[in-house]
Curated annotation (Swiss-Prot):
PROSITE patterns: FORK_HEAD_2, FORK_HEAD_3. The gene is foxe1. Residues 54-63 have a biased composition (Basic residues). This is Forkhead box protein E1. InterPro entries: Fork_head_dom, FOX_domain-containing, TF_fork_head_CS_2, WH-like_DNA-bd_sf, WH_DNA-bd_sf. GO terms for molecular function: DNA-binding transcription factor activity, RNA polymerase II-specific; RNA polymerase II cis-regulatory region sequence-specific DNA binding; sequence-specific DNA binding.
Length: 379
């Protein structure tokens, strides 16, 4: 039995080999490989992820401990928690650093962002500091129309960007009238005369009224025609054109004193009486007519005269009375209003004794002839 038992394994193996050969089936051969390293699998997976997300922008990783509020929300939060609903820039910094330790421990770069958001967003208003309150910097407040800028009072979600459109809601931008609107002026009548010791006739004040209305439009019944005269180039051109159409008839009656009677007839400005310390020079009181020749009409005007009670003109103290000059001849005037003086036949001259004599009078130059009147002014 021992021999049989010893030969049994060989028989069993031989029998197994015979069964395999007789049956014709072969066992499959499987090649076993070692598992790959985990680092290699992660690197391959990372490359695939990079290939898929190659065109996308990489999202900035969130910093640990940073609050989820925007800078606008931080500023609005600090202003809302202040007592006066306004804070300076330093007060905003102080509130943020006390409430959120992240901004206290990190660098100060966020302060630049706070300043930019204050100046670039319309929801914040700069308020100047009052003179009585010492300190540095202006105040910042939240716009009244931007108080509902955040949804349901939450500083995490903000609505559409606020735009300031209506300037009438702010006291600093309120204007009563536009700067380009015409100025409405109403002045009372000047009670006194324009010049001392002289009275102005009513027709003269009525004639100068249209010129003053150019700069002072009438806005109330208090506006009268006796306003101060304001002249410009347009009014003077228009006034000169009206003078060519009709002769001026303005008159001012000066009253020097109660005893002396004087009259002044002219078309221009007014002269006030002046007290001279010298002797008086006599002059004729008769007006000398002279004419203007205009392209379409011929105007007759009277020369301006000023008469005193004793028919003398004021002169210096070292001069002697001079006799009246003869009347001027009627001379034509060119288109620009220049007239050559007439010929004086007898002018008073000084002799060797210092007295005035009527002989050897000097004559003024004769009337210019031809076209020289347009270029040579009267002497």
């Amino acid at each position: 039995m021992t021999a049989e038992s010893q030969q049994s394994p060989t028989r069993a193996t031989a029998a197994g080999a015979g069964l395999q050969q007789t049956s014709g089936f072969t066992m499959p051969v499987v090649k076993v490989e070692k598992d790959p390293a985990p680092e290699a699998s992660m690197s391959n997976g990372g490359s695939e992820v990079d290939d898929t997300h190659k065109g996308r922008r990489r999202k900035r990783p969130l910093q640990k401990g940073k609050p989820p509020y925007s800078y606008i929300a931080l500023i609005a939060m600090s202003i809302a928690n202040s007592a006066d609903r306004k804070l300076t820039l330093g007060g905003i910094y102080k509130f943020i650093t006390e409430r959120f330790p992240f901004y206290r421990d990190n660098s100060k770069k966020w302060q630049n962002s706070i300043r930019h958001n204050l100046t670039l967003n319309d929801c914040f208003i700069k308020i100047p500091r009052e003179p009585g309150r010492p300190g540095k910097g202006n105040y910042w407040a939240l716009d009244p129309n931007a108080e509902d800028m955040f949804d349901s009072g939450s500083f995490l979600r903000r609505r559409k960007r606020f735009k300031r459109t209506d300037l009438t809601t702010y006291p600093a931008y309120i204007h009563d009238t536009s700067m380009f609107s015409p100025l409405q002026v109403a002045r009372a009548t000047y009670p006194n005369t324009v010049y001392p010791n002289m009275t102005m006739s009513p027709n003269y004040s009525q004639q100068i009224a249209p010129h003053s209305s150019v700069y002072y439009p009438s806005s109330s019944p208090a506006f009268s025609s006796a306003q101060p005269r304001v002249f410009s180039i347009n009014t003077l051109i228009g006034h000169s054109g009206s003078e060519h159409a009709q002769p001026p008839n303005r008159s001012i009656s000066p009253e020097v004193n109660s005893t002396s009677s004087s009259s002044c007839n002219y078309g221009g400005s007014a002269y006030s009486s002046q007290a001279g310390s010298g002797t008086m020079l006599p002059r004729s009181t008769n007006p000398v007519p002279y004419s203007y020749s205009v392209p379409n009409s011929h105007l007759q005007m009277n020369q301006s005269t000023y008469t005193h009670s004793n028919a003398q003109l004021f002169g210096s103290a070292s001069r002697l009375p001079m006799p009246t000059s003869p009347p001027m001849n009627s001379d034509t005037v060119d288109f620009y209003g220049r007239m050559s003086p007439g010929q004086y036949t007898s002018l008073a001259t000084y002799n060797s004794n210092g007295q005035l004599g009527g002989t050897n009078a000097y004559l003024r130059h004769a009337t210019y002839s031809g076209n020289m009147e347009r270029f040579v002014p009267a002497v």
